Amino acid sequence: MSDEFSLADALPEHSPAKTSAVSNTKPGQPPQGWPGSSPWNNPSAPPSVPSGLPPSATPSTVPFGPAPTGMYPSVPPTGPPPGPPAPFPPSGPSCPPPGGPYPAPTVPGPGPTGPYPTPNMPFPELPRPYGAPTDPAAAGPLGPWGSMSSGPWAPGMGGQYPTPNMPYPSPGPYPAPPPPQAPGAAPPVPWGTVPPGAWGPPAPYPAPTGSYPTPGLYPTPSNPFQVPSGPSGAPPMPGGPHSYH
């Protein structure tokens, strides 16, 4: 008895698996249960290519562009570009320093045009104290009190204030004031004379030409919005008094 054990020895003589294996096998043809040439049973066979792309096509020549890479290919990349982060804040001053002293202007500005022309109207005279001479050359020496002369006063010499153009009232005797009147008495009339005759209007007022109507009850004018009374069977008007039976 042999020590080797085979599957064919364990199956019964009339087993369907054993019968099909024997009956369906033909010389030079592989069994139908196994596929043909594949990388597993034929290492020298070329790998199968998907039917979507030709064998000569490369990812760069695909009309949709190269295949995306990364953890999530469908999401576009966001954020700062790859590389070391920029220093914050940036080094250096916030504004550039000035470039140095500015050069002098090449075109000088307009200078003085010379003496100014004589004005076409005289300047207004400055106010001077009262009594001062109009000509400054004729003014005498000033004393400690401004325009007052330090010397004695001449008879016709003007003082600090001008001579008034209207004489002062004379200090002669004035008429005595009237004596005080008793309360309730009419004061005397100091002007004119009182005309003779009675005081009052020249004639009495004329009487009225007609008498006014006696006040009394007047008829009420007709109301254009008054609703005429209807027959007894007519319905009451809206808003009017209602009779409850």
UniProtKB/Swiss-Prot annotation:
InterPro entries xref list: MISS
Compositionally biased residues, Low complexity: 34-43
Domain of life: Eukaryota
Transit peptide listed as a keyword: no
Keywords, alphabetical: Acetylation, Phosphoprotein
Modified residues (Phosphoserine): S2, S6, S15
PTM-bearing positions, type N-acetylserine: S2
Keyword Acetylation: yes
Region (Disordered): 1-245
Comp. bias regions, Polar residues: 17-26
Bias (Pro residues): 44-57, 74-127, 164-190, 198-207
Pfam families linked to this entry: MISS
Similarity field: Belongs to the MISS family.
Name listed for the protein in its UniProt record: MAPK-interacting and spindle-stabilizing protein-like
Organism from which the protein derives: Macaca fascicularis
